[in-house]
């Protein structure tokens, strides 16, 4: 009865494509799926708005986001960790 609760929140890994808004980053998540009829591998992508409280993530960073309560009309995700820093130009 004292088992640890399993997290039911989804986590995704994606690339930051915009950091222009205050405390918000736009994350592009790409996934590859096999077409049901033809069998070809197809790349699908989705953009998510994630909450970045400190403003520490910038364009090009690869980050992990976790599902959360609605923060605003379009923001339901929170940045949890940095996976890979963007290369300096």
From Swiss-Prot:
Q: Which GO terms describe its biological process?
A: translation
GO terms for MF: rRNA binding; structural constituent of ribosome
Q: Which SUPFAM superfamilies does the UniProt entry name for this protein?
A: Nucleic acid-binding proteins (SSF50249)
- GO cellular component term of the entry, any: cytosolic small ribosomal subunit
Alphabetical list of Gene3D superfamilies matching this protein: Nucleic acid-binding proteins
Q: Which UniProt keywords apply?
A: Ribonucleoprotein, Ribosomal protein, RNA-binding, rRNA-binding
Keyword RNA-binding carried by entry: yes
Q: Which PANTHER family does the record match to this protein?
A: 40S RIBOSOMAL PROTEIN S11 FAMILY MEMBER (PTHR10744), SMALL RIBOSOMAL SUBUNIT PROTEIN US17M (PTHR10744:SF1)
Instruction: Tell me, in a sentence or two, what this protein's role is.
Output: One of the primary rRNA binding proteins, it binds specifically to the 5'-end of 16S ribosomal RNA.
Assembly and partners are described as:
Part of the 30S ribosomal subunit.
Q: Which NCBIfam families match?
A: PRK05610.1 (NF004123), uS17_bact (TIGR03635)
The Swiss-Prot or TrEMBL record describes its family as follows:
Belongs to the universal ribosomal protein uS17 family.
The name this protein goes by in its record: Small ribosomal subunit protein uS17
Record the organism.
Polaromonas sp. (strain JS666 / ATCC BAA-500)
């Amino acid at each position: 009865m004292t088992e640890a609760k399993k997290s039911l929140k989804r986590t995704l890994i994606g690339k930051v494509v915009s950091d222009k808004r205050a405390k918000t980053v736009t994350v592009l998540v790409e996934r590859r799926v096999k077409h049901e009829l033809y069998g070809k591998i197809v790349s699908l992508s989705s953009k998510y708005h994630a909450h970045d409280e400190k403003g520490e993530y910038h364009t090009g960073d690869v980050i992990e986001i976790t599902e959360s309560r609605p923060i605003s009309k379009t923001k339901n995700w929170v940045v949890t960790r940095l996976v890979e820093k963007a290369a300096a130009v």
